[in-house]
From Swiss-Prot:
Gene field: rsmB
Organism, as annotated: Salmonella heidelberg (strain SL476)
Residues that coordinate or bind S-adenosyl-L-methionine: C254, A255, A256, P257, G258, G259, K260, D277, D303, D322
Molecular function via GO: RNA binding; rRNA (cytosine-C5-)-methyltransferase activity
Cellular component, GO annotation: cytosol
UniProt cross-references to CDD domains, sorted A to Z: AdoMet_MTases, Methyltransferase_Sun
EC id: 2.1.1.176
InterPro entries xrefs: MeTrfase_RsmB-F_NOP2_cat, MeTrfase_RsmB-F_NOP2_dom, NusB-like_sf, NusB_RsmB_TIM44, RCMT, rRNA_ssu_MeTfrase_B, rRNA_ssu_MeTfrase_B_ent, RsmB-like_ferredoxin
Stretches for region Disordered: 397-419
Pfam family, one: NusB
Protein's UniProt name: Ribosomal RNA small subunit methyltransferase B
Domain of life: Bacteria
Coiled-coil regions listed: none
Catalytic reaction equation(s): cytidine(967) in 16S rRNA + S-adenosyl-L-methionine = 5-methylcytidine(967) in 16S rRNA + S-adenosyl-L-homocysteine + H(+)
Location relative to the cell: Cytoplasm
Amino acid sequence: MKKQNNLRSLAAQAVEQVVEQGQSLSNVLPPLQQKVADKDKALLQELCFGVLRTLSQLEWLINKLMSRPMTGKQRTVHYLIMVGFYQLLYTRVPPHAALAETVEGAVSIKRPQLKGLINGVLRQFQRQQETLLNEFATSDARFLHPGWLVKRLQNAYPTQWQHIIEANNQRPPMWLRVNRTHHTRDGWLGLLEDAGMKGYPHPDYPDAVRLETPAPVHALPGFAEGWVTVQDASAQGCAVFLAPQNGEHILDLCAAPGGKTTHILEVAPEADVLAVDIDEQRLSRVYDNLKRLGMKATVKQGDGRYPAQWCGEQQFDRILLDAPCSATGVIRRHPDIKWLRRDRDIAELAQLQAEILDAVWPRLKPGGTLVYATCSVLPEENRDQIKTFLQRTPDAALSETGTPDQPGQQNLPGGEEGDGFFYAKLIKK
């Protein structure tokens, strides 16, 4: 491989773009993966995800082992050293190879004069590893979460916050959704077993299967033919609560990338579905998902606060609002969220959610169902949001999910091994 495509330096650049520039890893990583051989793509992903998962520990180690931080044009070296620490702590890469490749990464980022520094810091860590890790185990950084988020979780879940943090710091399981228009879940599990893999059904969500060991999608029976889709179990709860019926007019708002749109159509193939999202780029993935599954829906770009712009005066039998949120329930799947979110974002998101709810409620027919969902675990976006909505909306009633005092159903990450998710099912009187 060409030296400029040193795997460790690419990982360092990816993490730097997330932490310093506020970019999403899902946007940063794919173009970098194009620069490496197929056999190295998984390791590059592991290094990026792993460093972001354990960032506060790696930052703590750098502060212990270096007298001053790397700044300016040398900042990438700061993250390159983190990549070195991560390999030594969490991967099966032999230590000598981890050191050699990480040090060589300095050449790829045009900082060859810092090879000695990188080597020295990593070797110092190896010598002091046990002492450093014992000290780290009593530090505030041990939770691997920003302090503001730890405080919010402690306040919201006095007895469960550590469980949530531990779940967030795990690698996520791989969940699939069996397309019931092609196979029963048990039937597809048989095909999976024939292919030499094992899966387990979810007790509550009828299409959900957890793979014993994550696998590339091309290895899954019938993936290209639309027999199965990658989707977390908790996300599948949206269509379960929505309970779409054939012939109904259904709005899927904030629909990209289309996993819930296609699930609605698997449950009710004759439903008339409008999928709307504000992000035109992400809508391309809705089209891709519909095409792979051989389904049809109307897809439009639009802002949920202004429905007149994308549906005129149309009303719907059912509305799924998968609201923009902090995504604090899916941190194990997207560890960059911990470092992209800020404490002040929560109030802004709650305000946006309230505006969308108020704007779209008049578009629900009397007797119709609206499912409000987020992949957050924070009450400001979930129970508190629905509680205040019910107080100001006299023709809205809660159904199936919770009580007026504690509205909605909150799934915590790791519960039945799904992501953190919230649902509130509302009926228009």
